[in-house]
């Protein structure tokens, strides 16, 4: 019984010793004005591009490719920042071509050539909420004003 108490006591001391060390390092990246602006710009560009999905995909392919390229830049920017795995994961979900966000929407548009207004409206609301989550996470980081 004495050994167990000593072990638990040592564990408590170790945890208390580590608290100041881990408490000083941020668990999430600080605010980045560049990341915030990029997310807002991509939200606007994505929703404007989606509005055109009633028309043939081929008519808007250059615009779609530009949007995809900009989103890849956003995920690479997020990935390159220390302690930014949550935001990086949000961008990966947003871009997933098999998912239900921008990547999946663009894949479906390309496959079907055009989409119904009802589908576009529903998808836009979901995707807008996804962008708002990314923007909200960034604006809530330490250092934002």
Residue ranges and their predicted role:
Residues 1-13:
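Bacterial N-terminal signal peptides that target proteins for export
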Residues 70-71, 75-123:
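Long, amphipathic, charge-rich alpha-helical segments that form helical bundles/coiled-coils
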Residues 47-54, 69-79, 107-110, 132-143:
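Sec-exported extracytoplasmic/periplasmic mature domains
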Residues 60-68, 88:
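Acidic helix-start/capping segments at beta-turn-to-alpha-helix junctions
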Residues 19-23:
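C-terminal motif of bacterial Sec signal peptides marking the signal peptidase cleavage site
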Residues 24-58, 62:
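Immediate post-signal-peptide N-terminus of mature secreted/exported proteins
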Residues 117-145:
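C-terminal partner/receptor-binding element of secreted or periplasmic proteins
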Residues 36, 40-47, 65-72, 96-100, ...:
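Generic structural signal for well-ordered, non-transmembrane alpha-helical segments
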